[in-house]
Amino acid sequence: MNMKRKFAALAAALSLSACAGAQTGAAQPPTNVHSVTSRYGFDETVSRLKNAVEAKGMTVFALIDHRAAAQKAGLDMQPATVIVFGAPKAGTPLMVKDPDFALRLPLKVLVTETDGQVRAVVADTRALIADSGISVADVENTLDRVPALIEKTVGE
């Protein structure tokens, strides 16, 4: 077999392999986020999560309405609001232990609606602390409780 045919066969095999991998990967749920299907509408979900965070003594630093920003730019997108929140008493010791961890705080929860389904999405705690100087033990009574709070507040 000449070089051109070998190269063509190799390219075809790699293409098929990549396609098979992409299909397999698409079927796997992302492991770096925790997603909760809300039993409420979009606005109610945002409101309930904001109130739940504040009721737990955390501060809501910002609400980022991505859809409004898109519309202001002449674009359209699905409803998507990010609630930026945290508790300095919990976050400060983590940032003292690992100053670069400040890039991952404050926490964020995305509320989005696609095809009539409202979801609240937050970074998985293990993914959040991966490649940092923070251990699971450092966050088990703080950051690690956020997915349960979201589930309790809006979960089906």
Task: Name each model-derived stretch.
Residues 1-9:
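Bacterial N-terminal signal peptides that target proteins for export
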Residues 9-18:
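Bacterial N-terminal signal peptides
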Residues 20-57, 152:
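Terminal, regulation- and interaction-focused segments at domain boundaries
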Residues 36-44, 61, 137-144:
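Soluble non-cytosolic domains of exported or imported proteins
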Residues 42, 50, 54-111:
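Compact, glycine-rich, soluble single-domain proteins
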Residues 108-132, 136:
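Beta-strand/loop substructures that line and gate deep hydrophobic ligand-binding cavities in soluble
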Residues 125-156:
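C-terminal partner/receptor-binding element of secreted or periplasmic proteins
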